[in-house]
């Protein structure tokens, strides 16, 4: 696929709006540079426009629609790192960040099974929102792992988009109506019957490696495993 985006360069943009999504996740809407284009599932490198932080770049996935008049990111804070996400969460509307060229991440290849852990849901948000807008979300299934219900990013919207095909599993705080435990071989064997469909996997490096290897061992075609690279 040929991807078209803006000229490769740094773009200084202002924060337009902030929304608290969970206790440690914020949604950022920022100015969209003229001619800036991305495909849902793609990402860019972001830094804060301050002298000591300009070169501290971190990758974040776009979570809005490509035709939106703004860029949107959904960013989890990691306070123990005392780094970029901490600083980003301290910013206010009017503050500036730097976005760079778009790079390919997760590409939608048709109806399948989305498997996410924590902040790994972010590339899927853009894809699922795109499908929902086009009335093409049917046929997709989501398995989303988090520690507690309070950690689930955009819980209600995912239910709206996917209905009963949105499945949530909790690893630390069992609750009625939710699966309990990690997404491991036993879980996948119990929940899945079609291993020929596309699988979209995003989460920690360890989770992606383990889930991808497990799916391949259960019969999934390696070419049908879509992971962030």
Residues of each region from the PLM?
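FNR/FR-type flavoprotein reductase catalytic core
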Residues: 2, 6-8, 80-229
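Ferredoxin-reductase
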Residues: 2-93, 146-148, 171
């Amino acid at each position: 696929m040929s991807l078209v985006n803006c000229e490769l360069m740094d773009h200084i943009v202002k924060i337009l709006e902030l929304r608290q999504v969970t206790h440690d996740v914020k949604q950022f809407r920022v100015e969209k540079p003229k001619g800036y284009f991305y495909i849902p599932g793609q990402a860019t490198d972001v830094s804060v426009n301050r002298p000591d932080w300009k070169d501290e770049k971190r990758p974040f996935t776009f979570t809005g629609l490509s035709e939106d008049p703004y860029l949107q990111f959904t960013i989890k804070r990691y306070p123990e790192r005392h780094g970029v996400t901490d600083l980003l969460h301290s910013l206010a509307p009017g503050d500036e960040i730097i976005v760079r060229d778009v790079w390919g991440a997760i590409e939608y290849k048709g109806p399948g099974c989305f498997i996410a852990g924590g902040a790994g849901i972010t590339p899927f948000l853009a894809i699922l929102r795109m499908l929902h807008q086009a009335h093409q979300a049917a046929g997709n299934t989501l398995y989303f792992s988090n520690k507690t219900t309070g950690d689930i990013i955009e819980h209600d919207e995912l239910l709206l988009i996917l209905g009963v095909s949105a499945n949530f599993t909790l690893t630390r705080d069992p609750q009625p109506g939710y699966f309990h435990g990690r997404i491991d071989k036993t879980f996948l064997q119990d929940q899945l019957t079609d291993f020929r469909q596309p699988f979209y996997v995003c989460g920690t490096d360890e989770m992606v490696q383990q889930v991808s290897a497990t799916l391949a061992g259960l019969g999934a075609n390696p070419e049908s495993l879509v992971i962030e690279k």
